[in-house]
Regions:
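OB-fold ssDNA-binding interfaces and closely related basic DNA-contact patches used
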Residues: 1-113
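Extended serine/threonine-enriched, polar tracts that run as long, contiguous segments within proteins
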Residues: 101-167
């Protein structure tokens, strides 16, 4: 897995507090997206402020290094943009979504919602399943993406969102 920070594209709509994050691939720009195989779901689903999250546990350092390279590129590119826009005078740090665990690393992921409905594909044994029926301690293959970042309390924030989950 390789990531080129020079392909990060940042769009901003006047009056919004969010920066749209895209990755230039040929003639098109798409969300930064990648797959994590065989990740553990140690805690099941968490709910915070009416938002739903799943913490993944990953043992393979390759995934963490890839995420860290994305975070470093995003931090640098967005800091430059925020400086150009006059919103900051010094570089700002990106709030990572990765933290160390006993067995590897935790990655906090968000279950995307649109109009009070979950916007994610969840499959088990070839059949669609409700994301709310996920058990803690299970395993799955996740496709994650980033779509927006924002500045809050002097830090850059973002969330990995789940595009697709195939339970093992």
């Amino acid at each position: 897995m390789s990531f080129d920070k020079d392909k990060i594209v940042i769009d901003y709509e006047e009056g919004s507090s969010f920066y749209k994050i895209r990755y230039k691939e040929g003639a098109r720009n798409s969300k930064i997206m990648f797959e994590i195989d065989h990740a553990r779901i140690p805690f099941g689903i968490d709910i915070e402020y009416e938002q739903y999250y799943i913490t993944l546990e990953v043992r393979e350092k390759e995934y963490i290094n890839y995420i860290k390279s994305i975070e470093a590129g995003l931090e640098e590119t967005l800091s430059d943009r925020l400086f150009e826009d006059g919103l900051i005078t010094d570089d700002v740090k990106l709030q990572t979504q990765v933290r160390k665990s006993k067995g590897g690393y935790y990655i906090k992921t968000k279950i995307p919602q649109f109009k009070d409905r979950f916007n994610v594909t969840c499959i088990e044994d070839g059949y669609h399943k409700s994301i709310l029926d996920i058990d803690k301690g299970g395993w799955g293959t996740f496709v994650l993406y980033i779509d927006y970042a924002w500045l809050r309390d002097g830090s850059i924030h973002y969330k990995w969102k789940i595009h697709r989950l195939e339970l093992e």
